């Protein structure tokens, strides 16, 4: 068999095989609109709107406090927290798809009314699709505490 005929057969077989392949899936994007909705509800002080952003099995893990779970408790947590008194800005955000969840982490700056210095920290979120809405499944944040300027002396053992 001559080379040209063999090459034609190989190209034809490759094209025929490729014709039966499924097109490449379009990569799913992070549900940014949901995250933007949470931030808008927080900055406007809408505790009820914040509570609606969490899934049925959601847990909020605030710093220095017990885990908060259940829709009523999450809403009460945000009412007590008084969002809207704090202007939250986020930065350095990274997202990644983990199975059925979207993972998002980044830094935040909290601008508190009547305080001169912003509070800076980091956050982690897991988002899950419930019905047709992306909702928070886990939500955790913590402030970046500055290290002490000087360590106290250690008392001698004895």
Model-derived segments and spans:
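Surface-exposed, charged secondary-structure patches
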Residues: 75-117
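A mature extracytoplasmic/lumenal domain signature
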Residues: 54, 64, 94, 107-108, ...
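Positively charged n-region of N-terminal signal peptides that target proteins for export
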Residues: 1-5
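Short, low-complexity N-terminal intrinsically disordered segments enriched in polar/charged residues
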Residues: 19-56, 72, 148-158
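Bacterial N-terminal signal peptides
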Residues: 8-18
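A short gly/proline-enriched turn/hairpin at secondary-structure junctions
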Residues: 53, 58-68, 80-84
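Short beta-strand edge/turn micro-motifs at domain boundaries
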Residues: 22-24, 120-147
């Amino acid at each position: 068999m001559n080379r040209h005929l063999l090459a034609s057969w190989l190209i034809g077989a490759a094209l025929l095989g490729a014709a039966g392949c499924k097109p490449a899936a379009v990569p799913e994007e992070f549900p940014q609109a949901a995250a933007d909705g949470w931030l808008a509800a927080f900055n406007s002080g809408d505790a009820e709107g914040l509570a609606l952003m969490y899934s049925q099995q959601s847990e909020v893990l605030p710093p220095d406090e017990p885990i908060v779970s259940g829709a009523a408790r999450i809403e009460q947590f945000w009412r007590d927290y008084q969002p809207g008194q704090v202007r939250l800005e986020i930065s350095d955000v990274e997202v990644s798809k983990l199975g059925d969840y979207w993972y998002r982490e980044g830094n935040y700056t909290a601008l508190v009314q009547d305080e001169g210095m912003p509070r800076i920290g980091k956050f982690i979120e897991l988002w899950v699709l419930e019905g047709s809405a992306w909702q928070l499944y886990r939500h955790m944040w913590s402030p970046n505490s500055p290290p002490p300027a000087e360590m106290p002396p250690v008392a001698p053992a004895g």
